[in-house]
Design a protein with these regions (language model features):
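Polybasic, glycine- and aromatic-enriched phosphate-binding surface used to engage nucleic acids
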Residues: 1-164, 168-174, 178
C-alpha cells in the first residue's frame, strides 16, 4: 500500500466529504471481497500528493500481515473499480499489497483468476515454503510462478460462473490446470 496512515494524520478523515478519496485497510478485505465503507475510523483521505494516490482500477488486494494462528497466510480480496465509480483515485494503507496490471488494466476475469490462484491451498502452502514469516511481501508475491494469462482469465470465468469463492472451489478450478 501507498499510505502510512500514522505519518499522514493531517489528511485522514472519518467521513465522506467533498474532495476525499477512500483509504483501504486490510480490514476491508472480507471473505474474498473488498467491502467499503465499514464504519472504521480514517477511511478517507484528502490529498493531492501523487505518491499517496493510485488509479481506481481493478486490483487484487493481499493482506501484508496475518496472525500466526490464522490458517492461511495468503488472504486476498477482489477490488473492482466499477463498484466505486464515484472515485477516480483511491489510496491503500501500507498493510495491503496490491496486484495490478502494470502495462494494461486487468479485466474482471483476470482479477478473479488471480484470486483463484492466491486463494488456493497450493499457493498458500507454496508461499509458506518461500517465506516462513507471517508477513506477506510483494517480492515473494512477484516471484511466485503463475499460469499464462489466458488460463488465469479462464479460471476467473469459472469462479465467477460458479459464484463459489471458497478455498475448496478455488482448489478444484486450479486442479483443472495443474493436474
Amino acid at each position: 500500500g501507498l499510505n502510512v496512515d500514522f505519518r499522514n494524520r493531517e489528511i485522514l478523515r472519518d467521513e465522506a466529504e467533498e474532495g476525499v478519496i477512500p483509504l483501504f485497510y486490510s480490514q476491508h478485505i472480507r471473505q474474498g471481497k473488498v467491502e467499503f465503507p465499514i464504519r472504521k475510523e480514517h477511511e478517507y483521505v484528502v490529498t493531492e500528493q501523487k505518491g499517496l494516490m493510485q488509479d481506481n482500477k481493478n486490483y487484487l488486494f493481499v493482506k501484508h500481515f496475518t496472525a500466526k494462528e490464522e490458517p492461511r497466510r495468503l488472504q486476498c480480496g477482489v477490488y473492482l473499480a466499477k463498484k466505486f465509480p464515484q472515485y477516480q483515485k483511491i489510496s491503500t494503507q501500507n498493510k495491503i499489497n496490491f496486484v495490478d496490471g502494470v502495462l494494461t488494466e486487468m479485466s474482471e476475469y483476470l482479477v478473479y483468476g488471480l484470486y483463484v490462484l492466491f486463494n488456493s491451498t497450493l499457493y498458500d502452502e507454496y508461499y509458506r515454503i518461500l517465506n516462513g514469516s507471517t508477513q506477506v511481501n510483494s517480492t515473494e508475491i512477484n516471484a511466485m510462478p503463475v499460469p499464462d494469462l489466458e488460463d488465469i482469465q479462464e479460471m476467473g470465468r469459472k469462479v465467477l460462473k460458479s459464484k463459489d469463492y471458497s478455498e475448496a472451489n478455488c482448489n478444484l478450478i486450479l486442479e483443472g490446470y495443474c493436474g
